[in-house]
């Protein structure tokens, strides 16, 4: 059986934006991945004190954003799970759901790579997948040797990419919408229409 190379891109996607899509396209191309699965978070443990948009809206926006791209798909496994969202649990679930020979490539920003040694079951994460670390605007490149000291084995599981650097964030999109500004080119057209139709991110 031929191995399937599957990228995993998790996030709150509140909302999904063009930066997420550019990133996914670039990683797929650079690493020769067969597909990328977008996984909207339930209630991330690191955002437990923050209000995020309803899971159904975030899931629907991802579906709209990736429509027409057969190598992109979305799974709601974290949304369906009760309690906090942990990456190690998601990767274990994917190992059970996906075909046996699937190789997982977990995509994360340099900022999250820096924090990885403090993540729940971090050593299990690096055992279950290849990490694909991508730059974040304004984020210095992490010291991988130092991180490997904190989390032995990390370097063997790590692919560091120097691009794409995408200057778009969900918080920027939300801020512009709250201020009544346009978000053309920041989110796909279908997502912008959904946001408008459902009155998301507008000041009450």
UniProtKB/Swiss-Prot annotation:
InterPro entries reported in the protein's UniProt record: Cyt_trans-like, NadD/NMNAT, Rossmann-like_a/b/a_fold
Query: Which EC class is this protein assigned?
Result: transferase
Reactions accelerated catalytically? nicotinate beta-D-ribonucleotide + ATP + H(+) = deamido-NAD(+) + diphosphate
Protein keywords: ATP-binding, NAD, Nucleotide-binding, Nucleotidyltransferase, Pyridine nucleotide biosynthesis, Transferase
Annotated GO MF terms: ATP binding; nicotinate-nucleotide adenylyltransferase activity
Q: In which pathway does it act?
A: Cofactor biosynthesis; NAD(+) biosynthesis; deamido-NAD(+) from nicotinate D-ribonucleotide: step 1/1
Give a GO biological-process term: NAD biosynthetic process
Q: What is its EC number?
A: 2.7.7.18
The record's comment on protein family reads: Belongs to the NadD family.
What exactly does this protein do?
Catalyzes the reversible adenylation of nicotinate mononucleotide (NaMN) to nicotinic acid adenine dinucleotide (NaAD).
Task: Give the PANTHER family listed for this entry.
Answer: NICOTINATE-NUCLEOTIDE ADENYLYLTRANSFERASE-RELATED, PHOSPHOPANTETHEINE ADENYLYLTRANSFERASE
In Swiss-Prot or TrEMBL terms, this protein is called Probable nicotinate-nucleotide adenylyltransferase
Which organism is the protein's source? Dehalococcoides mccartyi (strain ATCC BAA-2266 / KCTC 15142 / 195) (Dehalococcoides ethenogenes (strain 195))
In the UniProt record, the gene name given for this protein reads: nadD
